[in-house]
């Protein structure tokens, strides 16, 4: 589910950003300035793939650990972090009012996240307060993971440029 969502972003982002940069600048100048300052308009598809690989490895390790140890609250934290991410993508699409390179798979995977949440709440021994706590943990981990992914992406981008293999 996560990778399906990430593939849309990796495959579509570079072309989308190229085609929509002026529109972003016109309608969302602060967002465009933020992206420009960080050089994200220049990132290659392979640079975005590095970020996706980073996220996938972390998600897989936490999920494997959760199942192996029976510590399903960690899986719940990952589910909630990803679900909140999808709701943010949905809000971005509603605000932008045009295709963004995450919306198709957001609409396809969000129902699964809702279904998994309902099933988890039906079978868990976690209290509602504990689920809120694990949701906060999931959001915090997702944010930290995002920062570290962009750090790795910036390193990879510089490596690409230095070697002249930037696409």
What kind of feature is each model-predicted range?
Residues 46-65, 85, 108-114:
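Core segments of transmembrane alpha-helices
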Residues 77-78, 94-108, 128-135:
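Non-cytosolic membrane-interface motifs at loop->transmembrane helix junctions
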Residues 80-89, 100-120:
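Hydrophobic alpha-helical membrane segments
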